[in-house]
Amino acid sequence: MKLQKPKGTQDLLPQDSAKWQYVENFTRSIFKQYNYAEIRTPIFEHYEVISRSVGDTTDIVTKEMYDFYDKGERHITLRPEGTAPVVRSYVENKLFAPEVQKPAKFYYMGPMFRYERPQAGRLRQFHQIGVECFGSNNPATDVETIAMAYHFFEELGIKDIRLHLNSLGNPESRAAYRQALIDYLTPLKEQLSKDSQRRLEENPLRVLDSKEKEDKVAVENAPSILDYLDEESTVHFEAVRSMLDNLGITYTIDTNMVRGLDYYNHTIFEFMTEVGGNDLTICAGGRYDGLVTYFGGPETPAFGFGMGIERLILVLEKQGIELPLDTQLDVYIAVLGQEANGGALDLVQAIRKQGFRAERDYLDRKLKAQFKSADVFGAKAIITLGGSEIESGQVVVKNNQTRSQVETSLEALKTDFASILEELEKQ
């Protein structure tokens, strides 16, 4: 058997991980501006944490979860999404306590797992960045969170982003609409796909966002959920729309958008862009005011979103957005002979301790091969160190782009490399 990675996974090689690190660090800097703090939860949870919160009839639970019984016969699942684990942690660690400032804002990033058909931007192990905000039912919280995602895309340079917006209302509005949708779809049941025929019995709202052609035709004239919002839900949604307008964030009302998870209420949204002629959702979320209670906590309004890192990277590449990656070496030390081996190690360590990125040759190669390595690493400067340099204590530092050079002492390099590099870059 040939040993290779499982289907639907990928190896992140150094040339790729540099992009990921940039996006992750950029994310942290944006979220920090909005006063979000990082939370980390296990990558596996008890099965019920996901099944009961996400919804027993959702595709995630019925088709996509990686679940198993461990050696203690506990039913475990690899996490398929980030919200339920964070809510579980919020309740278990009593973060609803009065001494925790509200709204309590958390972000996370890490791997998720779903058994799906692998394709561009969709893997069985994928990585998600998400935020969860607890303790505010103010529609301004909805808008701030959406605006934070918009701000993130804007600063990252992603173009042609479209915001789709809808409201699922409160439980009473949703129940009224659910019945209206059942009444509309029941006469059309035989025209629906097999999955949607099942959804009609279990969770009819899920028929609305089916990707099957026959289902799309069937729901073309379906009633709009906005017609079933009660006064409370209508006021909330109108406030969200008004504040988005004031911020200059354009959006499209999409009444067929219901999101794939059962815990949402009131505002839901998706950010989409086009990749290869197809619409790709790169960020989605909404309000989930009942989930904390469902996990045994006090009544707590909440709002959040998730976005896939793989999809973000895909969009950046497709749009030709060059990330300002800092992959250059500051200096490469070419080593001439074994007599310079120990001295080269002393020097490279001293330069690193000053905060610079440095490398040296360890393979006892010819100078030409070492200089080629310096070019591959993008080294700003090259130091050639041999027995004579060790003996005299004097070395030549060359600018690897302009070929200008300065002569200095080994001691100066070990204590003030910054001044030498600055002088070299001025020439």
Curated annotation (Swiss-Prot):
Coiled coil: none annotated. Keywords: Aminoacyl-tRNA synthetase, ATP-binding, Cytoplasm, Ligase, Nucleotide-binding, Protein biosynthesis. It is an enzyme of class 6 (ligase). Its EC number is 6.1.1.21. GO terms for biological process: histidyl-tRNA aminoacylation. The keyword Nucleotide-binding applies. Homodimer. Belongs to the class-II aminoacyl-tRNA synthetase family. HAMAP family: His_tRNA_synth. This is Histidine--tRNA ligase. It comes from Streptococcus suis (strain 05ZYH33).
